[in-house]
């Protein structure tokens, strides 16, 4: 994984985002999800940029960019796009811990990376991966929210109980 840290981002914040990104990739690269890539290959392919500029975070086939400004400011709301904001599993959440909100942001952007990088070659994503927040993206994001993020938010997802938010 190539990691870029913009000025103003502490080593602690960078390391936190790196651990979160690796945890998300580790979950998605399990055999049960049938991605045509190993965890090591996915890490090698991803470029992670961490910034603190009060801008949007993003994800594409080359990598992800995470803005930690909201985490620093203590943001307690995980906002999602209107198309799925009211979804029980992947929708928006209010009154969450700032670290859980950062987990949600990282999971969202890792989902975009997997969607665009491996979607065309993955059996269950091949027909649905193209649309930015379409069904392919939602399927990937559901996996991460159910198994990684929602347990931190205290949301019942049928998988485990509330866990520590530290990676």
Model-found features: residue ranges?
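Active-site recognition of the HExxH zinc-binding catalytic motif
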Residues: 104-117
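Metalloprotease/metallohydrolase-associated module, dominated by Zn2+-dependent proteases
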Residues: 2-101, 117-167
